[in-house]
UniProtKB/Swiss-Prot annotation:
Residues 201-246 are annotated as: Disordered. The modification Phosphoserine is found at S241. One of its GO terms (molecular function) is class I DNA-(apurinic or apyrimidinic site) endonuclease activity. Belongs to the universal ribosomal protein uS3 family. It is found in: Cytoplasm; Nucleus. Its main location: cytoplasm. The lineage of its organism: Eukaryota, Metazoa, Ecdysozoa, Arthropoda, Hexapoda. One of its GO terms (cellular component) is cytosolic ribosome. The gene is RpS3. This is Small ribosomal subunit protein uS3. Interacts with LTV1; the interaction is RNA-independent. It comes from Drosophila melanogaster (Fruit fly). Coiled coil: none annotated. Has DNA repair activity directed towards the mutagenic lesions 8-oxoguanine and abasic sites in DNA. It can cleave DNA containing 8-oxoguanine residues efficiently. Also acts as an ap lyase, cleaving phosphodiester bonds via a beta,delta elimination reaction.
Length: 246
């Protein structure tokens, strides 16, 4: 990814999108066991900063920062960055239960460990709702029982499926797990709560959201009072020059 070559805006947007998609796929493969939950790319004039979101940041960093240095070297070589022009950081996910990617990975490991599908899905569903989500949906499809493939859907709370608010409120993650009977597909959708501080959810309210303002408490007067204020006494004229002549 050479930033020195002049390219059109259209090609630049496409190039940035491909770079982020390939980087996300690479980190998903490398950090699958470390709770990888997404990546954010910040481009500055001097260098490119890559923030890796994960639930186990200590494992991403490695002993004395060895792992993060190895990842930096691999990304630098893969995407043709100059030395010192790229920097990788690890950031801990604020609310693990509200991250669809983290919960999809958690469900994948539960199914790999031999836990029953229904029990594993209900465990993930309960954990997401206890973390403060407005709603969630878990779909597992494949050869669940017998040789015929089918899908099981588990839903709790409120979930929106269309409209622009989906882009802000709904997080989606898809994963695949290879079991003895075949490959199972996992899809997790989490609807985030409204948060004016923009920490665990979007600060933009839903279009149909109605907020009721509590009325102010009225002051109870025990004795008659008046709001009439006595005007201050007029200032005496010490100097005749201040007097106005009619």
């Amino acid at each position: 990814m050479n930033a020195n070559l002049p390219i059109s805006k259209k090609r630049k947007f496409v190039s940035d999108g491909i770079f982020k998609a390939e980087l996300n796929e690479f980190l998903t493969r490398e950090l699958a066991e470390d709770g990888y939950s997404g990546v954010e790319v910040r481009v500055t004039p001097s260098r490119t900063e890559i923030i890796i979101m994960a639930t186990k940041t200590q494992q991403v960093l490695g002993e004395k920062g060895r792992r993060i240095r190895e990842l930096t070297a691999m990304v630098q070589k893969r995407f043709n960055f100059e030395t010192g022009r790229i920097e990788l950081y690890a950031e801990k996910v604020a609310a693990r239960g509200l991250c669809a990617i983290a919960q999809a990975e958690s469900l994948r490991y539960k199914l790999t460990g031999g836990l029953a599908v229904r029990r594993a899905c209900y465990g993930v569903l309960r954990y997401i709702m206890e973390s403060g989500a407005k709603g969630c949906e878990v779909v597992v499809s494949g050869k669940l029982r017998g040789q015929r493939a089918k899908s099981m859907k588990f839903v709790d709370g409120l979930m929106i499926h269309s409209g622009d608010p989906c882009n802000d409120y709904v997080e989606t993650a898809t994963r695949h797990v290879l079991l003895r009977q075949g490959v199972l597909g996992i899809k997790v959708k989490v609807m985030l709560p409204y948060d004016p501080k923009n920490k665990i959810g979007p600060k933009k309210p839903l279009p149909d959201n109605v907020s009721v303002v509590e009325p102010k408490e009225e002051k109870i007067y025990e004795t008659p009072e008046t709001e009439y204020k006595i005007p201050p006494p007029s200032k005496p004229l010490d100097d005749l020059s201040e007097a106005k002549v009619l």
